[in-house]
Regions:
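Short, basic-rich loop-to-helix N-cap that marks the start of a DNA-contacting helix
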Residues: 48-61
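Short alpha-helical "recognition helix" segments of helix-turn-helix
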Residues: 29-31, 59
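A short, Lys/Arg-rich alpha-helix, primarily the initiator
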Residues: 1-25, 72
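Short, charged recognition helix plus adjacent turn
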Residues: 72-102
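Recognition helix of helix-turn-helix/homeodomain-like DNA-binding domains
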Residues: 35-51
Length: 102
């Protein structure tokens, strides 16, 4: 029996649930403090926008952490969404390279 997978978690959900809400920081304040339009943060939090390198650098500096953390969240999310969309097609469409004997 195939295990049911949990849906991928958008980085915006992590931003909101693990950073903004516990720290009492509004989306508007974050946007102003990192010098981006408030709409950008709102769209990220609602899963309608990706975290770009620019945004990752700003979030990293604001939260005193690696910008790579934010990019890794985004990359992992995109990989999981794509994997879910492709489902079993990869098995049919991609042939694994076979090692050649010497």
């Amino acid at each position: 029996m195939k295990q049911k997978k949990l849906p991928p978690i958008h980085p915006g959900e992590i931003l909101k649930e693990e950073f903004l809400d516990p720290m009492g920081i509004s989306q508007y304040r974050l946007a102003k403090d990192i010098s981006v339009p408030p709409r950008r943060i709102n769209e990220i939090v609602h899963g309608k926008r990706s975290i770009t390198a620019d945004t990752a650098l700003r979030l990293g500096r604001f939260f005193a952490m690696s910008p790579q953390f934010w990019l890794n969240l985004q990359t992992r999310y995109e990989l999981e969404v794509t994997e879910d969309n492709l489902e079993n097609r990869l098995d049919d469409e991609v042939h694994v390279l076979q090692a050649q004997s010497a």
